[in-house]
Amino acid sequence: FYQGKTITLIVGAGAGGMGDIRARALASVLATHIPGKPTIVFEYMPGAGGRKSANHFFNSVRPDGLTLLRVSSSIVPYAVLGEKGVKYDIDKLNYLGTTEHRLYYMFFTRKEAGLNSLDKLRAANGVRIGSSPVGHTGYIQSRIVAYLLDMKAPKIIPGYEGQDLDVAIGRGEVDGRVATTGTAVQMDLLNKGTADFHTSIEIPRGFKDDRFVHLGLPDIEQFAKSPKEKRLLAMMRGFRAVGTILMLPPGTPKDLVEIMKAAVEKTHADPVFHKEYKKLTGGDDPSPLSPDEQAQVVKELPRDPETVALFKKFAGTDTLPSR
């Protein structure tokens, strides 16, 4: 079927960013594993956190197997949380897996703050936690961590972008933050001894970064006191574990979906892909999730009204709820 054909890969982000780079690392090898070795060309459709491209893909793209979409995982929480502007159904998409789904976050405070134990962290009043803008992943994670650790009147300070938060930590503008291990390595926190680490967020549950295992950090779920709080964490983890999504539109013939699934799995297992991914991303290793596994993550997300309402409280600016 694909002999002599051209596949259009829509990227739900701008050209040149990390989303584009990762898509190119995948596409360059994927084309060699699709029977017929079609040509893959790129289109870019940034906007509305991925909703613009997802809406277009769901409603306007012909399901002929010749158009793919690679888009941020954020389209899933937008749908589950009932956000405005969602004109697609996440349960009708043909998921083709992701090149990255494992993440290990840590909550740490700067050494100068003197919060070198959970008892001291809980006793301190108004600890300043820097985060990304309101509603973003880092903001939500910061509020959930502060809530589950029973911190006293924590001050979540949003609005930081990129390395601005690293600088703010260094200057003492904020006392702590939630960060990936990649950020912690970049800041050289272990070698410099400039941070106290308190808890981790494993995505998926059970995943640990070998570089930080020796710290023995408890996963944040150890601080959950009720099934409600565990569902909240399952939602938070699931939204991230979905990873960046590669998909075919609903209505695509099943045989073409299966051809593409098989090609993606062969790509994920190909050493050439791993080498290309690491080269283009500046040293990152891929952590692939198969098409069926990705679809299962979406299927298992908590969607009950109570959990949705609770999660939205952490995404907003209201005072943290009582436990």
Tell me the role of every PLM-derived stretch:
Residues 1-10:
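Mature N-terminal segment immediately following signal peptide/propeptide cleavage
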